[in-house]
């Protein structure tokens, strides 16, 4: 177990706060004219995603979090778990659907994902920034829609629903931003 003094705080440092792994987003060291120096720290809880702010006095220590981020390829899933494989040693890691959360709509076979482990237990699955998926269904367009914005709803192969321009057809591959769920372009 490694302990960090407030002088060692830096952006991206992974710590334990309230028995939950966190990553420091920003920190500000303040040395007042009178009194003890302190550090104001903003951090994000990795599991819940909440952003918190806390002030630490000089002399305070925080425990480091045993966090590993590994790049794995998604292979398959059963009723309970989604399985990711390390391509170097062919080890599989089972991840429960509740851990994947809303990112489940961006999970597709043979694509690489970042799996975050805390004490060798998966706590987060992060998809790539953008992925290419095939359109399997498009909502019908009404001919009398005069105030249309030039978009229609398309369902992709993973089941996610994405707004796409009118010129996109059924069966096309499109590129989607997984952070926002927005159509980027046709796949090349």
Swiss-Prot record:
Keyword tags: Cytoplasm, Elongation factor, Hydroxylation, Protein biosynthesis
Cross-referenced InterPro entries: Elong-fact-P_C (IPR015365), NA-bd_OB-fold (IPR012340), Rib_uL2_dom2 (IPR014722), Transl_elong_fac_P/YeiP (IPR020599), Transl_elong_KOW-like (IPR013185), Transl_elong_P/YeiP_cen (IPR001059), Transl_elong_P/YeiP_CS (IPR013852), Transl_elongation_fac_P (IPR011768)
Major location category of this protein: cytoplasm
GO biological process: peptide biosynthetic process
Subcellular location: Cytoplasm
GO cellular component labels: cytosol
SUPFAM superfamilies named among the record's database cross-references: Nucleic acid-binding proteins, Translation proteins SH3-like domain
Pfam family, one: EFP_N
Pathway terms, separated by semicolons: Protein biosynthesis; polypeptide chain elongation
N6-(3,6-diaminohexanoyl)-5-hydroxylysine PTM positions: 34
Record-level Gene Ontology MF annotations: translation elongation factor activity
Post-translational modification: May be beta-lysylated on the epsilon-amino group of Lys-34 by the combined action of EpmA and EpmB, and then hydroxylated on the C5 position of the same residue by EpmC (if this protein is present). Lysylation is critical for the stimulatory effect of EF-P on peptide-bond formation. The lysylation moiety may extend toward the peptidyltransferase center and stabilize the terminal 3-CCA end of the tRNA. Hydroxylation of the C5 position on Lys-34 may allow additional potential stabilizing hydrogen-bond interactions with the P-tRNA.
Entry keyword Cytoplasm: yes
Disulphide-bonded residues: none
Top-level taxon of origin: Bacteria
Function: Involved in peptide bond synthesis. Alleviates ribosome stalling that occurs when 3 or more consecutive Pro residues or the sequence PPG is present in a protein, possibly by augmenting the peptidyl transferase activity of the ribosome. Modification of Lys-34 is required for alleviation.
Matching NCBIfam families: efp, PRK00529.1
Family, similarity comment: Belongs to the elongation factor P family.
Protein name: Elongation factor P
Upper lineage: Bacteria, Pseudomonadati, Pseudomonadota, Gammaproteobacteria, Enterobacterales
Name of the coding gene: efp
